[in-house]
Regions:
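Rhodanese-like catalytic fold shared by cysteine-dependent sulfurtransferases
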Residues: 1-27, 35-66, 75-110
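Short, surface-exposed ligand- or partner-binding patches at beta-edge/loop junctions that are enriched
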Residues: 70
Length: 110
């Protein structure tokens, strides 16, 4: 392993539309924003596990299913995807976060 291999992403990034299709086929969508952000609006079926508590709550995440992570813009979810990947999860980051989800015209829950 080279010096810079530790910086390589161990997860894929998918569009909001692809994430929705994966969710409909059994993937688990985790919203890593803070609770007040989630309460304003979130993707249907998304489970709230804020980035700050993600590592403490790994046992709540099914290891046998594909995991999708979303935040506001894609930054926190990218960090979350790295944490989950490091812990053996099959994970994908939702590109552009919930903002891109909404721009794509996908449903949100208020």
């Amino acid at each position: 392993m080279g010096l810079f291999d530790i910086f390589k992403k161990k997860f894929e990034t998918v569009s909001p539309e692809a994430a929705k299709a994966l969710q409909e086929n059994g993937a688990v969508l985790i919203d890593v924003r803070e609770s007040h952000e989630y309460k304003n609006f979130h993707a249907p079926g998304a489970k709230l596990i804020s980035l700050g508590v993600l590592e403490r709550r790994l046992k709540e995440i099914p290891s046998e299913r594909e995991i999708l992570v979303v935040c506001q813009s894609g930054m926190r979810s990218s960090q979350a995807a790295g944490i989950l990947s490091k812990n053996g999860y099959q994970v994908k980051n939702v590109a552009g976060g919930i903002a891109a989800w909404r721009r794509a015209g996908l449903k949100v829950v208020r």
